[in-house]
Amino acid sequence: MNIENEKNVEIKVAGIGKTANNALNEIIKAVEADFVAVSEKQENLDLSEAGIKILVAEDFEKKIQKALENTDMLFILAETDEAENVKISTAVAKIAQSLDILTISIIAAPSEAEFAKTGKAELKQFADIVITVPTEKISEEINKIFIKNIKVIEDIIRERGIVNLDFADVNSMLKNGGTAVLGYGTAAGENKEEVVVKQVLNEILEKSIKNARKILMNILAGPEIGLDELSKITRILEKELETDEASIVWAYAMKPDMEGTVSITLIATDFS
């Protein structure tokens, strides 16, 4: 594996509408990517710190296509608070699909029902992955949720550990994955492997992972964790699945400052 190439995977984050435009100003500080702000209102763009700003107008699609040139992975962020946001997200995802860009849409909505009304089915036709952030069920700020979701995938690609996944691995797992859910967990002490998996599963609010056929996982742990413990985590996770066809792919990085602790981030997709 060429580590330098993995660092140079071209990632872009597009924020659609006022809420996502505002979120970009925080995400810029936390994520290694290029940023595109898209809005129907010039005043939203004027407040954005994104390097590329695109007003939804007659030449919108041409500008999006140019902005997405030479991109490997695209995150599309939006909230359903503005009626056209999901439609605009779909237009961006369609262009990304035509350029063979791995496209992950993260949409904040009060509920799945609300998201469905604003065009989830149409978006799923063009985005490889669609993640719903159920704003009625969470207390965290939307900005932090967006960052957390992006970092799960970015860290798997960019962070170098003992067991590494590269962009090709991530692309094969997420391409045409459909609906996806994410979970996070950290545990220490006895039985931490069981505890951390339970935490991850409890964190997932939108959907059970039981029918997921693809699971991408990033594990961080202290130096005492060995192959037996890593295999145990995978076995515990496999017991939660109802299909024998599931593929679980994971990366592992050892952190000296995490002695006695294990942390997992997980994305499950390709639901049967």
Protein language model features and the residues they cover:
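Tubulin/FtsZ superfamily GTPase core signature
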Residues: 1-272
